[in-house]
Amino acid sequence: MMSRNIPGLIPEGGVIGKLPFDGQWLTERSPTRRVPSHGTHLFATTYAFDFVAVDDDGLTAPARSMRALFAPEPPELFHAFGRPLYSPVAGTVVSVHDGEPDHVARRSVLTRIPYGLSQPQRIRQGLPAIPGNHIIIQVAEGPHCVGLVHLQRGSVQVSPGDRVSAGDQIGRCGNSGNSTQPHLHIQAMDSPDLRTAKGVPLRFEEFRQRSPQQGAPWALRRQSCPEQGAVVAQP
């Protein structure tokens, strides 16, 4: 179910970028429903989005079996895993981290219980255990940065100091860090230091959006935030 934009929930300003992927992706979390979108301001996630790739039937992976209810699944099973990701902005790469493993995926509530109980342990492990493999880009025109996290191990294609254009491939979607299934977490912030940065709004220049129901019509959106629960794609 799609959320409705709540007037005044997301302030003006921030960053305007391009969707960083091809194909159809479900907006799992968005600041259109609540701020902070992830329930916390920690690590500059105030206005962050979570996107997960879906097929024409709206599934993130092939239809689940009984095994998926009781056991984790390989991340390679999911449509998002390994999908190319592109820089949403022109700018300079200021920070990268690679080498964190891609975890098994957990679709059911039952399989997520032990993962949730281990959350404090991951936080104590330090910053890499939360975003996993990630890239942070300083926006060329402005003081802000954009971070893409939970990338696939070994997929990061840029290094600090590299200049990128919007649309350049920079990595692939993975399941590293604090992630239960392959997805892209993307956010804008006022500095590249995830420990001290504050989140700022992120909007996308132009994209198509529809409700998740099969056959739902597409609507063109400009300089706005994808709604939580909506499927989005390039224009």
Role assignments for model-derived ranges:
Residues 107-116, 183-194:
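Short, compositionally biased
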Residues 1-99, 211-235:
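Polar/charged, compositionally biased leader and regulatory segments
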Residues 91, 161-173:
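A structural signal for short beta-strand/turn segments enriched in small hydrophobics and glycine
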Residues 79-81, 130-131, 156-157:
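Short, small/polar residue-rich loop motifs at catalytic or cofactor-binding pockets
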Residues 71, 95-152:
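Zn2+-dependent peptidoglycan hydrolase active-site motif and core
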Residues 36-38, 125-127, 156, 162-165, ...:
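Acidic, glycine-rich catalytic/binding loops that coordinate metals and/or anionic ligands
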Residues 57, 98-101, 170-180:
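Short, charged beta-turn/beta-strand-edge "cap" motif at the junction between a beta-strand
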